[in-house]
Amino acid sequence: PGLMQTPIPPWMTLFTAIFMHGSIMHLLGNMWFLWIFGDNIEDDMGHVKYLLFYLATGIIASLTFVVLNASGEASLTPCLGASGAISGVLGAYLVLHPHRRVSVILLRMMVDVPGYIAVGIWFLFQLVSGFVDQGGGGGVAYSAHIAGFVAGMILAKPMSFAWAREETDPLIV
């Protein structure tokens, strides 16, 4: 999304932008996070609800970017990638699996930490980077990441099966 002319109706760009990426590294980074966190959330929601959740958080992230950048030079900046939807998955992971262990690289070693620490550090980085880069010149839509994350946290329980049952997570150590 952005406010530029496109060959498709502008409202469609909210959907299509989720499936476009600016570079191979952008795509690979998003797919890495989706691979680590997405399967758990899909298990919690089922295939159809997960697809709807993914699209909803991606569209909410894109709309937030457009609203916050609707004037000036930033309005012509395209916003694309799955990062807003992936951020939604991370928000859902924080709500549904805060204590599940996640492997992270720390000082050239693999360390298992609770999900709330791994996701919390990622979110803190998004917040700080978003405030530092308010001009939007860095090429990263931090506002979309933050909006997708918050949307994911809000939608996680209503869209999952976990709210209806006592959650027992066998991977908590």
Language model regions located:
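A detector for small-residue-rich transmembrane helices and their helix-helix packing motifs
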Residues: 1-173
